[in-house]
From Swiss-Prot:
Keywords: Allosteric enzyme, Glycosyltransferase, GTP-binding, Magnesium, Nucleotide-binding, Transferase. It comes from Lachnoclostridium phytofermentans (strain ATCC 700394 / DSM 18823 / ISDg). This is Uracil phosphoribosyltransferase. Its EC number is 2.4.2.9. Allosterically activated by GTP. Its cofactor is Mg(2+).
Length: 209
């Protein structure tokens, strides 16, 4: 079964608390998505492989560490995942970015793919799939399945908020994918939304309804 890391860092919990508030403005919510994503990514990237490299300091030569190969790729699930990617790129600006477009059928709650664009060398890269909400698990499962069909094996999934139902389904479908979660909430409601959650992340990021 995959490893699941639920964040307990005070900064993450504080920022998610602000995001939950219905009075939080669109701009503040958008900024917080990027900030929390960056903090979660910090933990998710903890075990990236390192290699030695010799450099010259102003005084002498030194052996330093660098991420081996530097082959990272962030894959946001459109559209809400885009601002999570922005936060991650603040830490690793040279990472490549792929995009997967999925929307949820409001009757079946199942994801429907409408777009996929990935770097040509994606199978050689460490892939970080990002989506703010892990609700039913359908979008995350579909996105990861799509990546695996393209020969990609090194995949991690990052989200801000998860429901137990969605996490369970994701683990059952992809037990080899490690999952990093900002907060694990109580449950889903009848419409498939996370409770207490923070509303529709995409709408709150973009100021739409």
């Amino acid at each position: 079964m995959s490893n699941v890391c639920i964040m307990d860092h005070p900064l993450i919990q504080h920022k998610i608390g602000i995001m939950r508030m219905k009075t939080t403005s669109t701009k503040e919510f958008r900024d917080l998505v990027a900030e929390v994503a960056m903090l979660i990514y910090y933990e998710a990237s903890r075990n990236l492989p390192l290699a030695d490299k010799e450099v010259e300091t102003p005084l002498t030569k030194a052996i330093v560490k660098e991420i081996e190969g530097k082959k990272l790729c962030v894959v946001p699930i459109l559209r809400a995942g885009m601002h999570m990617a922005d936060g991650i790129l603040n830490l690793t600006p040279n990472a490549k970015v792929g995009h997967i477009g999925l929307y949820r059928n409001e009757e079946t709650l199942e994801p429907v793919e409408y777009f996929c664009k990935l770097p040509s060398d994606a199978p050689d890269r460490e892939i970080f799939v990002v989506d703010p909400m892990l609700a039913t698990g359908g979008s995350a499962i579909a996105a990861i399945t799509l990546l695996k069909r393209r020969g990609i094996e090194k995949i991690r999934f990052l989200c801000l908020i998860a429901a137990p139902e969605g996490l369970k389904k994701l683990q059952e479908a992809h037990p080899d994918v490690d999952v990093f979660i900002g907060a694990l909430d109580e449950r889903l409601n009848e419409q498939g939304y996370i409770l207490p959650g923070l509303g529709d992340a995409g709408d709150r990021i973009y100021g739409t309804k």
